[in-house]
Each structure stands twice: as C-alpha cells, then as structure tokens.
Amino acid sequence: GLVGSEMCIRDSDHIMSLDLVRESFGYPPVYVAESEASWLYTPELNLSGLDRHNDIETLVLKPAEHFFIYYEKYDLDGFTFYVLPTPGHSIGGVSLVFPEGHFVLSGDALFRESIGRTDLPTGNFDQLITGIKQELLHLPKEYDVYPGHGPATTIAHEKMFNPFLK
C-alpha cells in the first residue's frame, strides 16, 4: 500500500485527488513545505478558487500531517529521498531527490528546456532561477528530472539547452 504522499506542489492541478488517495490507501501521512501548509485548505492559495478555474471544484483538503525539513533524508518503506528547496513557482516549492534511483522530482520548478511560472501568488522569477542553479544543477549530470508537467529530461540536458539557465 501507499506509505506516504509528498507534495512538491500545492497547485490544484496536482492536489485535486489527494483526499481520495488518502481515503483509498488508509490515510498515509502527507508531507508539505511548512510555508504552504495552509494552501491545502485555502482555495485562493491552491488556485482552485480562481475565476479561471470554473471547471475545477473548489478544494478544501485535510491538513498535512508533516512538514518537510530541507536536506533531510526520508525513508518511506524503502524509498529514500531528500528534499531540496526550489521556491519561485511558489514560496514553498521543493524538489525531491532519489539518489539510489538517480532522479529528481522537480515539481513545477524545472521543465525540459523551461521553468515554472512565476506570475501566480508568491511566485518569484529570481528566486526560482537561483534555487534551480544552486540546488538542482549541482546534482550529477546523469540524473533524470521528472517535472510536474511534460517530458522528462536530465540535469545535463538542462545545463546545456535550457535558455533560462544560461
């Protein structure tokens, strides 16, 4: 069964089924960045309350059980990862690094040859670029990057081809 759920991103498109997943898998603990804890149950912050989302149900989810600690190593039933701060798309953006699998879940921070939006509440372009350069681009170049949207990439590919990181 599911032993935990880690939220890189609090946007409604990433969390809309969270309570259903919790219920279906016996309420595993949920981890979020402390700075975004209230976003799970605040529609204006998780973006489900925006006028442009008329087709999405307003989300008021149960609170998370735990907060991430940056650079802390987590082991959930054999899945070992650590948390890197990659704010900028949102104030509490994080990326999850799985060293044994040689990959990172970058949420909405880093995409193939692009980066996340910074025009939403608490977005900050400079903070996003700094976080990506200081945290993600120091990972081994062969690491795969799995973003919150779109195709996978690698650290090497982004160093070479991402126009935002030049």
Language model feature labels by segment:
Residues G1-G4, C8-I9:
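Single conserved hydrophobic/aromatic residue that forms the stacking wall/gate
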Residues D13, S38-W39, A152-I155:
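Short, active-site-adjacent cap segments at secondary-structure transitions
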Residues M16-G26, H157-E158:
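Metal-dependent catalytic neighborhoods of phosphoester/phosphodiester hydrolases
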Residues F25-P28, K141-Y143:
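A short helix->loop->beta-strand "cap" motif at the edges of active sites that frequently abuts
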Residues P28-A64:
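Acidic/polar short surface loop at catalytic or gating sites that assists cofactor/ion binding
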Residues L45-G49, T80-K166:
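Metallo-beta-lactamase
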Residues E65-Y70:
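Short acidic-hydrophobic, aromatic-tinged amphipathic segments that line or gate anion-handling sites
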Residues E72-D77:
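Short acidic-hydrophobic surface loop/beta-edge motif
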